[in-house]
Amino acid sequence: MAPGEKIKAKIKKNLPVTGPQAPTIKELMRWYCLNTNTHGCRRIVVSRGRLRRLLWIGFTLTAVALILWQCALLVFSFYTVSVSIKVHFRKLDFPAVTICNINPYKYSTVRHLLADLEQETREALKSLYGFPESRKRREAESWNSVSEGKQPRFSHRIPLLIFDQDEKGKARDFFTGRKRKVGGSIIHKASNVMHIESKQVVGFQLCSNDTSDCATYTFSSGINAIQEWYKLHYMNIMAQVPLEKKINMSYSAEELLVTCFFDGVSCDARNFTLFHHPMHGNCYTFNNRENETILSTSMGGSEYGLQVILYINEEEYNPFLVSSTGAKVIIHRQDEYPFVEDVGTEIETAMVTSIGMHLTESFKLSEPYSQCTEDGSDVPIRNIYNAAYSLQICLHSCFQTKMVEKCGCAQYSQPLPPAANYCNYQQHPNWMYCYYQLHRAFVQEELGCQSVCKEACSFKEWTLTTSLAQWPSVVSEKWLLPVLTWDQGRQVNKKLNKTDLAKLLIFYKDLNQRSIMESPANSIEMLLSNFGGQLGLWMSCSVVCVIEIIEVFFIDFFSIIARRQWQKAKEWWAWKQAPPCPEAPRSPQGQDNPALDIDDDLPTFNSALHLPPALGTQVPGTPPPKYNTLRLERAFSNQLTDTQMLDEL
């Protein structure tokens, strides 16, 4: 064997070998754990203590198991070639449909309550436009006989006035023709009726109890002014009528509904639920929540929805309260209050109205992502409607509550709060002035309702597409109207004509439901994923690395600091408890030594002779070391001599 190979073999025999050439598996594993980039294996080896080592073994094995599981799923999904097909037919719940006649009460049943008001209204129209007293001479004579000998009490309470733009601060009374001074604020309301430009405007004046604070409301159209004036008195009169009596004065379900079909199956008045609205009378809701089951449909199209024929009965319309004929329909959820006056769709007579629906569901995230509310429990406004929370319900409830607080009574067109009454002249003489002032503050967002009320986080909305067609046709009119008259029987005492009827179709255009759902842009999973990506990209860190950092910098670091502080505390306590040691006498040192006490100026030769001798310094008690003992003995001198002698031999 060559000398170099012998030396290498001897080194391998005597020195431990690590790394891939380690002689044992244990040494190989130890080398791998100390030099690998996988943090868990290294922490198993370098960790001190059995508990920490077991924890790191558990973390590492768990991470390995998760990696194997996820990789197995990826491999299985990659090599899977089978497909699955799911075919299912879904049904959509049909919404609740509320139908109201535009005319709230039959004119023949409320005429005796409104006789004086209507007579003064006709007089005002005659004074302003030369309007005839009535459509029929006989009716005019009967109204005149009723009001004969009576003073106009409605115009006396709220006078109708004509304002001339040339005369500021003055107005002419409708009935007396006298001019009067008008003070206070003047509020002009825009007209929705076309009119000829004129220098005169029509309005009325509302004052508080002491008549010192007044507000004048003017309209560019006399028709709007008279209708608004009539509506105020109408609400005051009807607020004093009991609810049961008002239900009897309005239309019954048998009178309003002539025919009914849903999803191709016949239905009748028993499938509708009564809902009394203060301004629209008796309304009827189809597929209400009071039904045992909510109806649904599995097909789209007009043949699979709701089809009804409505009897409008135009002759029973109040000529001053409403100026159009037809019905109103609103589509809503089963637990939602139908705001007919806000979002109702009008149905024309002698026409078929087709309404195609498309459902959209919206789901919003609550705080901190938005200011919506789940059920209204976090809104400090009491819900006076017997329905689920919505933004409209909150706004109307807030206004009605403010009305009761400031005016002492409730507005007629909204539900009553607990322990409140509707406004009327007898108990609340100035409620109209208070109502108008409060409504103006509400529109200008001065009551705080808009800032308190929140939107609902989840709601359903039906997008409507409306189309019209003439109904019945000229050809079918000859046989259809007699048949419908016969079907009505005793409900109708006359032959029906096309202007008394309206047909309504409500259906889903298709069964495609659109859902709008909000999701947080940065969820906790996304946050952890982004953190992991940044740590892995820039520092090659993993979850195990993060745990290692937590162990070193948050556990070991603070434990070392705590241990040092504890050691210092123990030393301080031991020093505190130890008896005090006697102090050794101080030897004069430094400037305390009198021998070093010199003047600021350098001494001269003569002055140095007079200085006192220096005090003897203390001699140290320990003798100086013997340096001879530090000399090195040549222990191998004899051995070296022997070696030299052997060489000489």
Curated annotation (Swiss-Prot):
Q: Name one GO biological process term.
A: intracellular sodium ion homeostasis
The UniProt keyword set, sorted, is:
Cell membrane, Disease variant, Disulfide bond, Glycoprotein, Ion channel, Ion transport, Membrane, Phosphoprotein, Sodium, Sodium channel, Sodium transport, Transmembrane, Transmembrane helix, Transport, Ubl conjugation
Tissue expression remark = Expressed in kidney (at protein level).
- Which residues does the record list as glycosylated? N209, N497
- Provide the family line: Belongs to the amiloride-sensitive sodium channel (TC 1.A.6) family. SCNN1G subfamily.
Q: Subunit structure, briefly? A: Component of the heterotrimeric epithelial sodium channel (ENaC) composed of an alpha/SCNN1A, a beta/SCNN1B and a gamma/SCNN1G subunit. An additional delta/SCNN1D subunit can replace the alpha/SCNN1A subunit to form an alternative channel with specific properties. Interacts with WWP1 (via WW domains). Interacts with WWP2 (via WW domains); inhibits the channel. Interacts with the full-length immature form of PCSK9 (pro-PCSK9); inhibits ENaC by promoting its proteasomal degradation.
Report the protein name in the record.
Answer: Epithelial sodium channel subunit gamma
Which organism was this protein described from? Homo sapiens (Human)
